[in-house]
Structure formats: C-alpha cells, structure tokens
Amino acid sequence: MPLPEKNNRVIITSALPYANGDLHIGHLLEHVQTDIWVRLLRANNITCHYVCASDAHGTPIMLRAKELDTEPEKMVEEFRSSHMKDLDSFNISHDNFYTTHSEENKYFSELIYTKAKESGYIES
C-alpha cells in the first residue's frame, strides 16, 4: 500500500473491543499491526491521529453487566481501564482512547459528521 501524501492528515483506528471482558490475542494483534502503520506514517512525516475506544454499546454490555450484577457504566470503565493497561504494556501509541459513551467521542463524532455534511460528503 502506498503512503498517503505528506500534506494529507490521516485518522486511524482499530476495531473497538467491547468493554465486557479482557482483551484477547486477536485484539492485541490488530492493535499492534495498526500501531506499526501509525509509526511508519509518522516516521515519514505524515500527520496522523490514532484513536480508539472501548465499545460501550449493545446487548453484550447489558448481558455481561447483568451477569456481573453491576451497572453497565461501572463495568465499562473497569474494562476500559484494563484494556488501556494491556495496550500500554505492548507500547501501543493511541493518541486518544475513550469509550463510545464518552463526552469526547460524542464531541468528535458530531464534529466529523458536521464537517463531512458541510463539505457535501453527506446528503440528508
């Protein structure tokens, strides 16, 4: 795959792991591969931002919280912290790592959507 042009800015992410359990080798493999790509771009002076989050949405979250007899939000934060600790131990260099319910995620999702719509990439 050719490198992006140096004047392009790139947003990179990995698949968001559910915040309902520990990371497994598949999660780690993907994050390591993505981190290698990020480091290659940065070594070539290409501006990129590596973002990810623990997925806090959906049935897997509700079922696991019920199984653990805890509030979903509390469980999500505990697994998010665990995910970050595991990824840090592999020197994964996320610029931002939130949850899908965080204020930061809401802000950036709305910002990206608004900019894309204003630029004509989204019609409604």
Segments (PLM) and residue ranges:
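N-terminal, positively charged nucleic-acid-binding surface of large information/translation enzymes
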Residues: 2-124
